[in-house]
Amino acid sequence: MSFLIVANWKMNGTRSSFVDFIGKLNNKSNEITSKLVICPPFTSFQSNIELNNNIKIGGQNCHHKEFGSYTGEISAGMLKELGCSYVILGHSERAHETDSEIKLKSETAIESGLHPIICVGENSEDYKNKKTKEVIEYQCKNRLPTQGKYTIAYEPIWAIGTGNVPNNDAIAEVIKSCTGKKHIIYGGSVSSENIENLLSIPNLSGVLIGSASLDFDHFYKIIQQVEKKFSLN
């Protein structure tokens, strides 16, 4: 599997900025071997947008039901119809979601032909109390689907948007505790300044990038460092 680079735009960007961003990526695609997934707001989706083979579109959430009276929600099937291949699930910024709801969403996503990226991560209190492994193992047990292809995104809640990142040994320990649980990527304050260090972590399958993915030049610097790393291997 190619190294996975996921851009989570959250509630940022417009349709025109998304089209411009994708156009720039398409122009650079012959220099990129990594798999790129861009997750803009729903309003930016265009089902007819031209994408080169290594660029995919993802959603930032989906409901576990196919349709119904769920104001403000979107189904996995709707995302698929809009041209999505991936969907981020269980992000900590989505308040009050239970582990069982996240599991249902992941199973529905797979049934609809999407590849779920399922977030796990400890809060600052659990981190300080050295309960990271315990929390991650519990979340994996209760959030992950029983079958199908998926990716785990280890994104410690205390690291999101703070500029703080766990040391490589701590991330490697989480990956080790998830052995046999498919592919594992890291998210939480990923930037062009720390990506080189993160790339030295054994068995890391990719990265989930937030604010650093909004600026094309910054995002492309990250891609270039990933490409440099794997071209030397």
Curated annotation (Swiss-Prot):
- Would you tell me the protein name for this molecule? Triosephosphate isomerase
> What residues make up the catalytic site?
H91 (electrophile), E155 (proton acceptor)
Is the keyword Isomerase in the record? Answer: yes
Give the lineage: Bacteria, Pseudomonadati, Pseudomonadota, Alphaproteobacteria, Rickettsiales
> What domain of life does the UniProt record list for this protein's source?
Bacteria
Which GO molecular function annotation, any one, does this entry have?
triose-phosphate isomerase activity
Where do transmembrane segments lie in this chain? none
Question: Reaction(s) catalyzed by this protein?
Answer: D-glyceraldehyde 3-phosphate = dihydroxyacetone phosphate
Q: What does this protein do?
A: Involved in the gluconeogenesis. Catalyzes stereospecifically the conversion of dihydroxyacetone phosphate (DHAP) to D-glyceraldehyde-3-phosphate (G3P).
Annotated Pfam families: TIM
Q: According to the UniProt record, what class of enzyme is this?
A: isomerase
* Keyword Transport among record annotations: no
Give the location in the cell.
Cytoplasm
Question: What are the BP-aspect GO terms?
Answer: gluconeogenesis; glyceraldehyde-3-phosphate biosynthetic process; glycerol catabolic process; glycolytic process
| Pathway(s) this gene product operates in, as recorded in its UniProt entry | Carbohydrate biosynthesis; gluconeogenesis; Carbohydrate degradation; glycolysis; D-glyceraldehyde 3-phosphate from glycerone phosphate: step 1/1
| Enzyme Commission number | 5.3.1.1
Q: What interactions and quaternary structure are annotated?
A: Homodimer.
Q: Which family does it belong to?
A: Belongs to the triosephosphate isomerase family.
Where is substrate annotated to bind? N8, W9, K10, G161, S189
Any one GO CC term of the record: cytosol
Q: Which keywords has UniProt assigned to this entry?
A: Cytoplasm, Gluconeogenesis, Glycolysis, Isomerase
